[in-house]
């Protein structure tokens, strides 16, 4: 056998040349103690605040407390499989989630993983969950309406694109129903509206029952509204860090639309539960407690989240992110810590009351206490024309109704005011899942403020409204089109609307 030294040395040299020098260096630490979803880790000296770290078995966590001798890590998932002495690896990445149109129609958890069984999400972009809100220069004041389809809100407490409007009330007063109707109301624009008007919806469920979230998704799906919505769910059985993270994750998904010149609406349901889970994490991390045992930065938790909802100026693409945070009160106590915090952060609030709900006034909006700090800037001119007087009349009605309980002999003017107020209150009622287009709301409220309901018994107001709307849709669609395109009630339209009301009122009686 002939051994050629030159050939062998050539092969060896070749192999040496191709020898890989890459060795993966990862910074690791050791678990000192673990319990209640919190791990104390030794090592990881260069870890960043908010960085994702990895435990054995693929469980992830987020470094929140950076102390002199250890790192406090909150665990996204079960801590049962983590034990003392386990190796913890740095990922080098701050917590981020997938964003983009690929998420529309899907249900994801707080880290953006799909939980609806419809396969993986092929999103190409990712975004950090906790980024700084836009400054003052890139913003523009709110001036376009964000129609919810609810007469009581669109007429009296209008919400604009880029606004933060708080929905606050006790349990079972219809807070989620308002969010759901606002989502369903966008269907008409998505089906045949211009691209620039479309409003994409993000619903963040925090600490709710899985059955409740499933019901919400089912309603959206049945009514064709899931295709433009993203659902982020951190349910009651999920660990506290997931419930804390979910609103930030949903916000990052909504910001994608805002920053690309589109419009998005995000509902946080509800932020009281996020504050509770943040309190749990903070106390377990041994941060000092403050009022009601919440940590000192619970105001900052909500303010940095809600400040990210904004209307951008034209140079930034003129997109917007509108936020509808929900807060649940205990026994109508709006002066508790978290409710007062969020009221002071938002641009107005919609108060829902149990008493009104049980009186059959639904949506149970207390029109006297609810405000929108953007106001009529977020309404089209037609709505301003009819809704301006309804506010004043309802305010007078509430004042008179309080006095009328004592006096029996009322003069004719007071009696007229009370009658009108009762009928307008009846007019603002609306069944669930039946949002109205803005032009239809305008027509109905026009009838109310111009005295067409005054002669009707209060019980027939709803029937009159339904009848008049179907009459307009069949006979007077030109009137509705005129209000929609002109965005105002011209003298010509006013004449036609009055004529239509006269002819319908004759046939109705």
UniProtKB/Swiss-Prot annotation:
Subcellular location per the Swiss-Prot or TrEMBL entry: Cell inner membrane
UniProt cross-references to Gene3D superfamilies, sorted A to Z: 2.40.30.20, ATP synthase alpha/beta chain, C-terminal domain, P-loop containing nucleotide triphosphate hydrolases
Reactions that this protein is recorded to catalyse: ATP + H2O + 4 H(+)(in) = ADP + phosphate + 5 H(+)(out)
Keyword match Cell membrane: yes
Keywords: ATP synthesis, ATP-binding, Cell inner membrane, Cell membrane, CF(1), Hydrogen ion transport, Ion transport, Membrane, Nucleotide-binding, Translocase, Transport
Keyword hit for Membrane: yes
HAMAP family named in the record: ATP_synth_alpha_bact
Subunit structure: F-type ATPases have 2 components, CF(1) - the catalytic core - and CF(0) - the membrane proton channel. CF(1) has five subunits: alpha(3), beta(3), gamma(1), delta(1), epsilon(1). CF(0) has three main subunits: a(1), b(2) and c(9-12). The alpha and beta chains form an alternating ring which encloses part of the gamma chain. CF(1) is attached to CF(0) by a central stalk formed by the gamma and epsilon chains, while a peripheral stalk is formed by the delta and b chains.
Binding site for ATP: 169-176
Positions of the record's site feature: Required for activity: 370
A GO CC term attached to the entry: proton-transporting ATP synthase complex
EC code(s) of this entry: 7.1.2.2
Primary localization class, coarse: membrane
Membrane topology per record: Peripheral membrane protein
Disulfide bonds: none
Molecular function terms, GO-annotated: ADP binding; ATP binding; proton-transporting ATP synthase activity, rotational mechanism
Function, in words: Produces ATP from ADP in the presence of a proton gradient across the membrane. The alpha chain is a regulatory subunit.
Protein name, per record: ATP synthase subunit alpha
One Pfam family from the record: ATP-synt_ab_C
Similarity comment: Belongs to the ATPase alpha/beta chains family.
């Amino acid at each position: 056998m002939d051994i050629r030294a030159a050939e062998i040395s050539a092969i060896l040299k070749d192999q040496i040349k191709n020898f890989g020098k890459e060795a993966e260096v990862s910074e690791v630490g050791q678990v000192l103690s673990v319990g209640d979803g919190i791990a104390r880790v030794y090592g990881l000296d260069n870890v960043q605040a908010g960085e994702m770290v990895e435990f054995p078995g693929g469980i992830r966590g987020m470094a929140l407390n950076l102390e002199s001798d250890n790192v406090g890590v909150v665990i996204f998932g079960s801590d049962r499989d983590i034990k003392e002495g386990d190796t913890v690896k740095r990922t080098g990445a701050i917590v981020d989630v997938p964003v983009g149109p690929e998420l529309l129609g899907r249900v994801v958890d707080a880290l953006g993983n799909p939980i609806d069984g419809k396969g993986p999400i092929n999103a190409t972009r990712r975004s950090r969950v906790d980024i700084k809100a836009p400054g003052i220069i890139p913003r523009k004041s709110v001036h376009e309406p964000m129609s919810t389809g609810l007469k009581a809100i669109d007429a009296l407490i209008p919400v604009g694109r880029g606004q933060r409007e708080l929905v606050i009330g006790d349990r079972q007063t219809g807070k989620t129903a308002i969010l759901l109707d606002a989502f369903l109301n966008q269907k008409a624009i998505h089906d045949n509206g211009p691209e620039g008007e479309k409003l994409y919806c993000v619903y963040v469920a925090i600490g709710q029952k899985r059955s409740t979230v499933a019901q919400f998704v089912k309603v959206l799906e049945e009514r064709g509204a899931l295709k433009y919505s993203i659902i982020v769910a951190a349910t009651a059985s999920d660990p506290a860090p997931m419930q804390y993270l979910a609103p930030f994750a949903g916000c990052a998904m909504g910001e994608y639309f805002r920053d690309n010149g589109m419009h998005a609406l995000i509902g946080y349901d509800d932020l009281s539960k996020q504050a509770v889970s943040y309190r749990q994490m903070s106390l377990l991390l041994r941060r000092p407690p403050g009022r009601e045992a919440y940590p000192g930065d619970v105001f900052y938790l909500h303010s940095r989240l809600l400040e990210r909802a904004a209307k951008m100026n034209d140079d930034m693409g003129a997109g917007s992110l509108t936020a509808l945070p929900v807060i649940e009160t205990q026994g109508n106590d709006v002066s508790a810590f978290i409710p007062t915090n969020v009221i002071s952060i938002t641009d107005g609030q919609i108060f829902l009351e149990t008493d009104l709900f049980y009186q059959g006034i639904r949506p149970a909006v207390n029109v006297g206490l609810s405000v929108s700090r953007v106001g009529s800037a977020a309404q089209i001119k037609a709505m301003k024309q009819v809704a301006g007087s309804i506010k004043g009349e309802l305010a007078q009605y509430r004042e008179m109704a309080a006095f009328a309980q004592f006096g029996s002999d009322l003069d004719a003017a007071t009696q007229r005011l009370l009658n009108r107020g009762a009928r307008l209150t009846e007019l603002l009622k609306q069944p669930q899942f039946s949002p109205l287009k803005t032009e239809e709301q305008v027509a109905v409220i026009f009838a109310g403020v111009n005295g067409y309901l005054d002669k009707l018994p209060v019980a027939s107001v709803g029937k009159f409204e339904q009848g008049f709307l179907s009459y307009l849709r069949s006979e007077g669609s030109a009137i509705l089109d005129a209000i929609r395109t002109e965005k105002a009630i011209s003298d010509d339209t006013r004449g036609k609307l009055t004529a239509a009301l006269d002819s319908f009122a004759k046939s109705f009686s």
